[in-house]
């Protein structure tokens, strides 16, 4: 009887460790590394009341199939501000935006976060933990859409993120609009 209890306990511990280790490994936070890129207004431009920002990351930048449970962006701001945002992630075969109106519909993406984000004064990494993890397939490119619904401007035109250069070049992987 004692041997059976110990055996059952051992099986329970082994199954629990397999479950929890699989769960931990499958949930990743993707760091959006713009260290070699310009200081720009995306993914949020605190100088405006509303905004929509989309960027495409290639499969080679994102890597193999996994669950993505959050994002981090490098921020450089002159003061602390809070924004009301939504974040969508999606798969796409697009490699860039061919025109300034070539947005990928958020209806074809997964809403992963809806809430507020606080951006602290100074240079720092700003993390967002998703409400729902996104299952990245490891094959397609990844599109990230960030919508700012704050409704008032808070900030300075000098507040910036490290991100892909926003330009009109043929390989432009970032698209945005602010009002």
Question: Predicted regions: what is each one?
Answer:
Residues 56, 72-74, 86-88:
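Short, conserved beta-strand segments within well-ordered enzyme catalytic domains
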